[in-house]
Amino acid sequence: LNYVPRYRTVLKSEELSTVDENNWKHCFVINKLDHMIYTVMWKGQLVRINPKNRTAEILLKKISNVATGDGGKAGSDSYIAFSPIKGEENVLYVSLADFHQIWRVDVSKITPEDKDTYNGESYAGKAIYEGVMNGKGWEDGLLKNAKFRHPRQICFTDDGKMYIADSGNSCIRVIDTTM
């Protein structure tokens, strides 16, 4: 028996030929409904991968509308999770660690026309409204008032509570997504 790991690559179209140049991903998740793999690249592209034929497609060119001040060259580590709430299983939550914010996207409602213009919905983090530098820190409160400092991994309980590993503040934060 040969236990050598198999190297599998994603088959990229012409549009995706350079998507991974100076770009990477930190996490991926499988959607329970469509059985596709989703990831958000460092530069913000939402990518869907079909695991059966290994083809990929860019669903959105950029999650968030963060102005980085460098012509869009800066990116963010992204950590993602689908909602467990019945009826919202296609809602993907995206934690943008370097921007101190959380965004969400309903992947079932994305159309080809959205690719260039839609950035998802801002969800939590004062940095969305006050900017990356002013909005980071430590503050609990409502979604728009919460301050994060490098929010990373996201996970959910069955009743819709989102737990966020806020690594810069060395704590676990909780958001009730049903409110």
Language model segments and positions:
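Conserved beta-strand positions in repeat-built beta-propeller and related beta-rich domains
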Residues: I30-N31, I37-K43, L92-D98, I164-G168
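Carboxylate-rich, polar loop motifs that coordinate divalent cations or form catalytic acidic clusters
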Residues: N2, V29-L33, V40, V47-I49, ...
